[in-house]
Amino acid sequence: MKHRRVGVCSDAGPGSWGRVLSGRWTATGLLATILMAPAGVRGEPYFAVQQGAKCVTCHVNATGGGMRNAYGSTWGQRTLPAQFVETSAAADWTGRLNPYFALGGNLRANASYTDVPNQTSTNEFDVEELRLYLLVDAIPERLSVYVDERVAPGSAVNLEAWGRYWFADQRWYVKAGQMLLPFGLRLEDDSAFVRQASGINFDTPDRGVEIGLETARWSAQLAVTNGTAGGAETDDGKQVSTRAEYVRSGWRAGASFSLNETEVGDRQLAGVFAGLRTGPVAWLAEADYIEDDGFPDGQRSQWAGLLEANWAYRTGHNLKLATEYFEPDEDVDEDEQSRWSLVWEYTPVQFLQLRAGVRVYDGIPQSDLQNRRFAFVQLNGYF
């Protein structure tokens, strides 16, 4: 089988690197119960750290991202925004149409500016994505079918389509279909070095099966998939990915591992991640080590790291400061890359978030792209 090797510095345009650079973020939390009554949108793991919760508390997906359940939707409306706008509706929107069907969605529109040394700077308006979610609870809280579809821009692309069965004790589940792989922090920003270097992000779902365990303090998953990032299988190898996290009210720590066996060469990932709450600041950290045999010049050993602080200085406001590191080849000296990000996130009312930020890249002098500057403003509407 082939696997998708995602370059950390491949394109500054909106189609891939530039698109995720424009800040793939949503104003929803990683909170919520296993109530399977979702609304749309992917969340940020720092919400979970702030609230002392697990991903499954808020999301249909036990590994985070995608639809939120009833608790997560209510939190995103009543707690997250600076102001809750009262309506004539009898109850808050949760996405639940009836006991068996739920819908959700998300729209992101961007204005961005990119400055690459020795090149003409660019600025553009762009629709990053429109995504729709559908959840069918054939047996509520036990048997579900879930679909996550990107319907714009361009032609429709399926990101997730799976069925899941929870056992009676609500501790174990089994899932099969196309899904996001369990590895590291489920960051909203796919352009983060830890998500690009690992190749496991929102753009690289895969097809296979997953077994999960959820207890009061532990969240763990094991997935066996084709290892083709949703593409056609080409050999008899498979990718095995696993993630385990221990959660306390003020901190959490976890580890991940993935092995993708392919004809062109195996790819092995190992990582650790953590979260810590210190007053109004939620800290996130991740470090990943990659051994990749698929390069033409032989095996490469790589490192990627992230340290992020999120300061909720006022209701509806968050200030994010992140520093990142990427070592593309341990055998090559002085080829490291770094990135600094400062992002302001403002949720004025429910279902609406505004983001504005800058990202500064620092790489080898020979690469203009690795030394670019990027600024963006994003409007995110979600339901």
Per-region residue spans from a language model:
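Outer-membrane beta-barrel "beta-signal"
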Residues: 54, 346, 371-383
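Detector for outer-membrane/organellar transmembrane beta-barrel domains
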Residues: 242-330
